[in-house]
């Protein structure tokens, strides 16, 4: 009978540590200024890549998508309020969502950032279906700012703490515990 290999936890890599550090810094800053850190932390996690190029790509996807979805959501919600001042016909949001997704995809293609469609669609759906009428503009603007803060934190951390600068520390940790890795994790 063949013996199954033992399960072994993967090591903790630089990207893992820098992502955790970035999200924690965002949360600490937001707690200090009395704001909810959720979307800044999400931006920080999305914005961390294995290097600056990857951070730009990952963070750009999130930020560009959030900005497109945020402005589009504000415009469509404004149109919804013009067409339906009483707010009783929620079903009107369905064709507005369909229109919004089409426009979002076209805009993402125009900006040559097609991977911004998914995060942009999330923001669009939240604004249309889950944001109170009286706060949809402030919600969308806050979401864009918070996402930008998180992405910028991760890009700064990746810029200030590149792999080349951290490798000597990583070697020391690897020698003492054997668990920290320099891989993509």
What positions do the PLM features span?
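Alpha-helical transmembrane segments and their membrane-interface boundaries
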Residues: 1-185
């Amino acid at each position: 009978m063949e013996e199954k290999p033992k399960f072994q936890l993967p090591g903790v890599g630089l990207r893992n540590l820098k992502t955790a550090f970035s999200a924690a810094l965002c949360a600490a800053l937001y707690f200090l200024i009395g704001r909810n850190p959720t979307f800044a932390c999400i931006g920080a996690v999305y914005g961390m890549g294995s290097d600056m190029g990857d951070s730009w790509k990952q963070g750009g996807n999130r930020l560009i998508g959030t900005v497109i979805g945020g402005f589009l959501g504000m415009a469509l919600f404004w149109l919804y309020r013009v067409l339906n001042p009483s707010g009783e016909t929620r079903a009107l949001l369905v064709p507005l969502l369909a229109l919004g997704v089409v426009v979002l995809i076209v805009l993402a293609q125009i900006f040559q950032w097609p991977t911004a469609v998914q995060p942009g669609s999330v923001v669009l759906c939240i604004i249309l279906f889950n944001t109170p009428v009286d706060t949809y503009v402030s919600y969308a603007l806050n979401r864009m700012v918070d996402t930008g803060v998180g992405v910028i934190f991760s890009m700064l951390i990746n810029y200030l703490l590149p792999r080349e600068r951290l490798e000597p520390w990583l070697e020391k940790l690897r020698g003492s515990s054997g668990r920290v890795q320099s891989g993509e994790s």
